[in-house]
Amino acid sequence: MRFFLLVITPIFFLINGSFADEHKTKFKDIKGYKKQFISMHYKKTNRIIEVKKSDGFPVFEGDTSIQVTVNREDAGCGHGNPEKLQINCDGKGNRSRQEISLGEMKLKNKEHIYEYAVYFDENYESLEKGAVVVIGQMHADNKAKGCHNCCHFWAQDTKYKGENYYTWVSKSAYSSDPVIIGKIDDLKGKWTHLKFHVLWKIDETGRFKIYRNNEVIADFKNTKTLADTCTGGYMKFGIYRHRTIGYWNSDWESLPDQRVYLDNIILRKPKKDEKFKK
């Protein structure tokens, strides 16, 4: 049995991209974001690639999509010596990731629409042993005084009431239960389009409306949408796995690779007829 000797923070996504090497990139399936980076740890393999419909890969719209694959070894530290503090690294055995980071944004009092389409590979396997897989998150920028939360919201594959679901979760709209997007087994091998319409507020005057395949599945009104005192953030898309320590301490080689496809990743302002009425 292997023993995990380093201290791991209980906060899921506290690892900030500044501790990793970030490589500029440009995917044409991402629109509206000013910056794109592959969030890549030092000396790790990039498994995020553009694939073509003409080569037989699943594509939601147009000719290409983004294939994301994560391996159990996709963890580590950035340049320098951040490994002295485990909080600054992805702890091997407890986390692995392949993500695209889309640049910091001011959020407070803004009204934004975030869209993306996700396709779970037919061979995608959900994790066991209490592990969680995040596919899409709005990370907090941690710049404001009192901003200690990792994220404003995220979408994850996790076990819920005995089965694995893709769910939306928020640390901001703190009174809300997870929003069920779909059972993982039902989402494999097909595209699911998601749209998040958000009025970013630090008090309980915000709103968060969620669409799945153009149908409203949740609408949180008069709610806090910014975590803690946080006023900014940045979207990350890809696969981020945490709490995989159960595999490390038992059968590390049984932790499977996972693959999803992403397309039509869009940030935009709402059109005049889409804006929330005051």
Go through each PLM region and give its residues.
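Low-complexity, Ser/Thr/Pro/Gly-rich disordered linker/stalk regions
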Residues: 20-278
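Bacterial N-terminal signal peptides
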Residues: 6-14
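Positively charged n-region of N-terminal signal peptides that target proteins for export
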Residues: 1-4
